[in-house]
Curated annotation (Swiss-Prot):
UniProt subcellular location: Nucleus
Disorder noted: Macular degeneration, age-related, 6: A form of age-related macular degeneration, a multifactorial eye disease and the most common cause of irreversible vision loss in the developed world. In most patients, the disease is manifest as ophthalmoscopically visible yellowish accumulations of protein and lipid that lie beneath the retinal pigment epithelium and within an elastin-containing structure known as Bruch membrane.
PANTHER family reported in the protein's UniProt record: HOMEOBOX PROTEIN, PUTATIVE-RELATED, RETINA AND ANTERIOR NEURAL FOLD HOMEOBOX PROTEIN 2
Domain comment quoted from the record: The Homeobox transactivates the Ret-1 element in the presence of CRX and NRL.
Protein's UniProt name: Retina and anterior neural fold homeobox protein 2
Cross-referenced InterPro entries: HD, Homeobox_CS, Homeodomain-like_sf, RAX/RAX2
Region of interest (Disordered), residue spans: 1-33
This protein's UniProt keywords: Age-related macular degeneration, Cone-rod dystrophy, Disease variant, DNA-binding, Homeobox, Nucleus, Retinitis pigmentosa, Sensory transduction, Transcription, Transcription regulation, Vision
PROSITE patterns assigned to the protein according to its UniProt record, in alphabetical order: HOMEOBOX_1, HOMEOBOX_2
Length: 184
């Protein structure tokens, strides 16, 4: 038996026929990573209303520099989390919302004899070269925009879990440096 082009099992069962294109892969959006400031503002808005209207969502989206659809999806996910917490509380008889354990602030101050010298362009003081910004810490413009506590750890709010783990890694690294280079 002879098959002409376009006939046979390859095209009958879902293969490509003449003039058809291969289906394009569905684009998958990357996960949104929210800043501490964005999460704080979103949580504050959630405390005020679990179902904000479009105008409120658009206003909030502009405030935190996110698309409105991201804010909308955040509220959907947050409501699901809230319902899940409510179910857990009613099932266990607990009254308070589950919280992450408070992590202690880790001390990073070293005694003066053990401190490592910093290059002048890295430190928190005025720039060594005028017109060149500092590399560590938020600048005064950001502090003024977001308020004095916007960049502080917010352990009570539960948003700084990642920050706490980074601090722990930094502490371990500092201890490793102390072991590697004992003070002179």
């Amino acid at each position: 038996m002879f098959l002409s082009p376009g006939e046979g099992p390859a095209t009958e069962g879902g293969g490509l026929g003449p003039g058809e294109e291969a289906p394009k892969k569905k684009h998958r959006r990357n996960r949104t990573t929210f800043t501490t400031y964005q999460l704080h503002q979103l949580e504050r808005a959630f405390e005020a209303s679990h179902y904000p209207d479009v105008y409120s969502r658009e206003e909030l989206a502009a405030k935190v520099h996110l698309p409105e659809v991201r804010v909308q999806v955040w509220f959907q996910n947050r409501r699901a989390k809230w319902r899940r917490q409510e179910r857990l509380e009613s099932g266990s008889g607990a009254v308070a919302a589950p919280r992450l354990p408070e992590a202690p602030a880790l001390p990073f101050a070293r005694p003066p004899a053990m401190s490592l010298p910093l290059e002048p362009w890295l430190g928190p003081g005025p720039p060594a070269v005028p017109g060149l910004p500092r590399l560590l810490g938020p600048g005064p413009g950001l502090q003024a925009s977001f308020g004095p506590h916007a960049f502080a750890p917010t352990f009570a709010d539960g948003f700084a879990l990642e920050e706490a783990s980074l601090r722990l890694l930094a502490k371990e690294h500092a201890q490793a440096l102390d072991r590697a280079w004992p003070p002179a």
